[in-house]
Amino acid sequence: MRRKPYELKVEVKAVYLREHSRPDAHQYTFAYTVTMENTGTVPAKLLGRRWIITDANGKTVEVVGEGVVGEHPYLRPGEAFEYTSAATIATPVGSMHGSYQLIADDGMPFEAPIAAFSLAIPRRLH
């Protein structure tokens, strides 16, 4: 199967940060670790990101910014970059999705989708 020139594989894992949360104040904080891999055939640089964060009440926040954690990773084909960040929502359950904006070495801009993933506190048995 022939690879596409402009393609970024994105995987995300989220965990609840109990020590940084304040349920009594409706603040639930989650860390998420993103692993991105250039699965295309052309080197590319990450320019920006767009996140859509939604809580269980349907409140949606859009976060748009340059780079990720202060960096603009440059990825050759087959190279990966990983980072961890955090988000706080007002409910114990929510979700995030979005996209990364990149520019390939040949000048072609492209967007890589970030599939929706859950933000959820672990269930407890009493």
UniProtKB/Swiss-Prot annotation:
PROSITE patterns: APAG. InterPro entries: ApaG-like, ApaG_domain, ApaG_sf, Uncharacterised_ApaG. It comes from the Bacteria. Pfam families: DUF525. Transmembrane segments: none annotated. Coiled coil: none annotated. Residues 2-126 form the ApaG domain. NCBIfam families: PRK05461.1. This is Protein ApaG. It comes from Methylococcus capsulatus (strain ATCC 33009 / NCIMB 11132 / Bath). The gene is apaG.
